[in-house]
Regions:
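A broadly conserved sequence feature marking short terminus-proximal activation segments
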Residues: 107-156, 450-454, 460
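A cross-taxon signal for low-complexity, glycine/charged-rich
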Residues: 238-239, 243-270, 644-645, 649-691, ...
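A charged helix-plus-loop insertion that forms the helical arch/lid used to bind
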Residues: 89-104
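Short hydrophobic alpha-helical runs that function as membrane-insertion/retention elements
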Residues: 388-393
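C-terminal low-complexity, glycine/proline- and small-hydrophobic-enriched intrinsically disordered tails
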Residues: 622, 626, 720, 727, ...
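Catalytic cores of secreted or luminal carbohydrate-active enzymes
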Residues: 750-770
Length: 848
């Protein structure tokens, strides 16, 4: 029999696909479209890993599945090529990031083609190509024109190793997400996108998304909407208070409210110096006995007294070294008194102002009113520093504050002090005023430089490119209204990579358009993306792309407000011991090693779909890879056997030396059991009686098996239950080995197999002389001609019989079949008292 040689087979079909371009997508009037994409990869020097394969293969299975149903499918491909790894490699080796990235892209493309993916290679994009980042800069300018791209000075996470700022979501457990080094806080002027402008719409639209619940929950929590009130607490000094005796007790009260005769002149800052706090419980204001400020609070330097300044500055420096996670842990509270006081507007009493790191600058205003009687953290703080705890009743807050809604989400920090990124299209005049680069001067190209190391001041290497820095742009004179050309200095920060990935799904529709970021006709036909597949970026990329979509819809550039209809979020492929794969651990599985070991791409693809439920992590199992190879080998043997016997038109079983692959009902794994010398499963097994019953089965039963399999695989792919779809195909092949397979059986097998193993399936379809259109099932064939009847003796299971469905109405015939069974005879030698047959349960009980 002809041998299954996957590498030779795959080389043949990949050459055909390269030449014929069967996956080129074009707009077709009246044909339903399907736009499927994966989160595009960063092309590292290490090349593809098996995690990429899972991601890409999910997309490919769906692409081929819908193409076989004759939808107009677009599956593009791209590379997220800007970023720190390429630049750090350039600093280390002296090689240009541009050259290194080009090599990596070439390698990734070659590897993707080895896996046989149905990609339209004419729709390939690269975020570091000028043709692409010209339009990233255009996107920035649209946001800038509407006031949604702006600069401000604030404390930012700073990685001292990579020498760049990091967004909140790029700090993991207090460390840089790239290099793993501990981060610190640094005050810098940075560029931001005002994503908070769309906070409500981003939140309100989440529930309607066809996305995994855990991703929707993560986005809700990241946005973090809180409804409450803002309350002003005036800052005052000692001269603003008088002592008042009430029933023998003394309290300090604001002089303003008791009159100048009792308190003297008001402090000069009384009316214009205040601390505004946000609280979700304004009704507890009577219990507020002190205020607490975050160490980063912007007005702290103006509040602290001279006596407390040294202690406050020392505490702030220590606090800024901690991550937000560390500051929120249930450790002993720390803090320092500012030496300043405020007035509780409800009680009119003097309360101290403290600084503590359990208050975060990113929440509310960065200041809280502490109500130790109602809040556990405030109570712990009060007890440690001997601050008053006042039990209080709840009240109406209207006279003291104003309703306010705040969000945990901050505006999106998008500037980076690195060379290898998209240049920000801004230049500064001699007075430091920012001006946009005119659109007709885009793209602002990255200059060729020799030294990629950022300087110690925090500026990127672009600051060293003196010729590049100077640019003349038209600027309108504020006084005369006239426009004149002036010399400016370019911005030396570059855009965060997330800016490049926030719009690439729209660039795919017209990747070579020189006049538009995305062509209007193409975006109207293809977008939004129907299915998007990935395993990362739940609250970064997936939130940013929604923000940009809503913004550009408001500007009239997009006809929809949500960019992605359905999101598939899959688990990781881990090492065999269950640990995460990493180069440092030396446990990375190279997919090309698996292919070149003789298993081929089809085996690798099918195994990764069979490895487990798509949404869960899975451990790599080399033994199961071999099991999947044997399954595909059996498919090929069925084909060869059928072709060899096609002239006779007979059904033929394969040689008895082959291996039966059975799916365990308890675990999603392959197990092996050898056929006995007669070509049947071992005696006494359920499979043996089943095989005997179907050795020469009626056409109705064969049709039932075939249509049942079509229905199962179709529905499983729709539900992204790829592992059970592959299992159903394995079961179908087992049945064909028992019964023998004719052409119709193999046609169905090849068509169902193609999304998973396209090379083998294409070979089968070619030899069978049919196209790949997806098969359909008919309901009338889903009811089997045979059913299983359980036989008990005195209530204990003793046998299972396969009987014709029509015989269920003939109780005596079923009893006769049972009594004739060898397994039952040994229990009925002394006679039978009675028999009880329950038709609905398909159960016969024999009482002896």
């Amino acid at each position: 029999m002809e041998r299954y040689e996957p590498l030779k087979l795959e080389e043949k079909w990949q050459k055909i696909w390269e030449k014929e371009k069967p996956y080129k997508a074009v707009e077709k009037e009246g044909v339903p479209k399907m736009y499927i994409a994966e989160m595009f990869p960063y092309p590292s020097g290490a090349g593809l890993h098996v995690g990429h394969v899972r991601n890409f293969t999910i997309v490919d299975v769906l692409t081929r599945f819908y193409e076989q149903q004759r939808l107009n499918v677009m599956r593009p491909f791209g590379y997220d090529t800007f970023g720190l790894p390429a630049e750090n490699y350039a600093i280390k080796t002296g090689r240009s990031p541009k050259d290194v990235t080009a090599e990596n892209v070439t390698n990734f493309r070659k590897q993707a083609k080895r896996l046989g993916y149905a990609i339209d290679w004419d729709r390939e994009i690269n975020t570091s190509s000028p043709e692409y980042y010209k339009w990233t800069q255009w996107c920035f300018l649209q946001l800038y024109k509407k006031g949604l791209a702006y600069q401000k000075e604030s404390y930012q996470w700073w990685c001292p190793v990579d020498q760049t700022v990091l967004a909140n979501e790029q700090v993991e457990n207090g460390c840089c997400w790239r290099c793993g080094h501990e981060v610190e806080k640094k005050k810098m002027k940075q560029w931001f996108f005002k994503i908070t402008e769309y906070a409500d719409e981003l939140l309100d639209g989440i529930d309607a998304l066809d996305w995994p619940d855990k991703i929707k929950t993560m986005q809700k929590n990241w946005i973090g909407k809180s409804v409450g009130a803002e309350i002003d607490f005036p800052i005052v000094g000692e001269t603003n208070f008088v002592s008042i005796r009430d029933n023998g007790s003394e309290r300090r009260s604001a002089a303003r409210d008791d009159g100048p005769a009792r308190g003297g002149e008001q402090n000069q800052f009384y009316n214009n110096r205040r601390i505004t706090v946000f609280t979700t419980r304004p009704d507890t204001i009577y219990g507020a006995t002190f205020l607490v400020l975050a160490p980063e609070y912007p007005g702290l330097d103006y509040i602290v007294s001279d006596d407390a300044r040294e202690a406050v500055e020392k505490y702030r420096a220590e606090a800024l070294l901690k991550s937000e996670i560390e500051r929120q842990e249930n450790k002993e509270k720390t803090g320092v008194f500012t030496g300043a006081f405020a007035v509780n507007p409800a009680t009119k009493e003097k309360i101290p102002i403290w600084v503590a790191d359990y208050v975060l600058a990113g929440y509310g205003t960065g200041a809280i009113m502490a109500v130790p009687a109602m809040d556990e953290r405030d109570r712990e703080f009060a007890e440690k520093f001997d601050l008053p705890v006042v039990e209080t009743e709840l009240c109406e807050f209207g006279q003291f504050g104003t309703p306010k809604t705040t969000y945990r989400m901050r505006d999106w920090l998008i500037s980076r002090q690195r060379y290898w990124g998209c240049p920000i299209p801004i230049a500064y005049d001699a007075e430091g005023n920012a001006h946009p680069i005119p659109e007709d001067q885009l793209p602002v190209l990255l200059p060729e430089i020799d030294d990629y190391q950022p300087d110690k001041s925090g500026r990127s290497a672009l600051a060293k490119a003196e010729d590049w820095l100077k640019v003349k742009i038209p600027v309108k004179d504020a006084k005369t209204g006239k426009t004149k050309m002036i010399e400016c200095t370019r911005e030396t920060d570059t855009l965060d990579g997330y800016a490049c990935s926030s719009w690439y799904l729209w660039r795919y529709v017209s990747p070579h358009d020189a006049e538009h970021a995305w062509a209007p006709e193409a975006i109207n036909y293809w977008a939004p993306t129907d299915i998007y597949v990935g395993a990362d970026h739940a609250v970064a990329h997936l939130l940013y792309v929604r923000f940009w979509c809503k913004f550009f819809a408001d500007q009239g550039y997009l006809p929809f407000r949500e960019p992605i209809k359905k999101l598939i979020y899959h688990g990781y492929i881990n090492a065999p011991d269950g640990k995460k794969m990493s180069k440092s651990k030396g446990n990375v599985i190279d997919p090309l090693d698996v292919i070149n070991d003789g298993y081929g791409a089809d085996t690798l693809r099918t195994y990764e779909m069979f490895i487990g439920p798509v949404e869960l992590d899975a451990a790599w199992d080399p033994r199961s890879v071999g099991g999947v190879y044997r399954f595909l080998n059996r498919c090929y043997n069925l084909l060869c056997s059928n072709v060899a016997n096609s002239c006779s038109g007979s059904r033929r079983s394969l040689p008895s030396t082959d291996v039966v692959c059975q799916l365990s009902s308890r675990k999603n794994e392959l197990v092996r059991s050898s056929l006995d010398s007669s070509g049947s499963p071992p005696r006494g097994s359920r499979a043996n009686s089943r095989a005997a019953a179907l050795r020469n089965p009626p056409n109705q039963e064969l049709a039932h098996i075939r249509h049942r399999t079509v229905k199962k695989v179709t529905e499983d792919i729709y539900k992204c239950q790829f592992n059970t779809a592959v299992s159903a195909l394995m079961e179908y092949v087992n049945e064909l080995y028992k019964t023998g397979a004719d052409k119709e059986d193999l046609v169905v097998l090849a068509k169902l197999l193609k999304p998973f193993a396209p090379h083998l399936a294409s070979e089968m379809l070619e030899r069978l002389g049919v196209d790949d259109e997806w098969p359909k099932w008919e309901e009338k064939y889903l009811v089997s001609d045979t059913v299983e009847v359980v036989v008990q003796v005195n209530g204990k299971l003793r046998a299972k019989l396969m009987v014709d469905t029509a015989d269920l109405d003939d109780e005596q015939k079923i009893v006769d079949l049972a009594l004739a069974d060898k397994k039952i005879k040994k229990y009925t030698v002394d006679g039978v008292k009675k028999t009880i047959f329950v038709k609905k349960a398909k159960l016969l009980n024999i009482v002896v």
